Amino acid sequence: MCIAYHPSLKIKYGRVHPKTIAKHGVVSAAVTEEMADGIKKLTNSDISISSNGIAGPKNEMYSSDQSGTLFLSWNFRDKIKKTKRFKLEGGRNSVIDKAVYVALSMCLRYLKNELRKDN
């Protein structure tokens, strides 16, 4: 797992192109998609999940209405790629917990579908 808050880390480890950040902003579906693809390639894994968002609380960079914004991207063997935007309620820790739950739930759903195909 890689946690990359700073744009330079998203570029270096998530293999996000700087032009994507410049065009779409650091918190965006496009950046999250590139991170999922980049981490998958970097680790040669079957599944990668990336998250990107604003857990909160508001600060000088983000307003309170942006708190709880979350983008999640999943890359399953390069066959299924999904990116979704969520608006989660609650404080910072609650938003983070919910983000983890949603990400892992989607991963589990994919794995169950793959197991059904194998049987």
Enumerate the language-model features and the residues they cover:
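Short alpha-helical segments enriched in small residues
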Residues: M1-N119
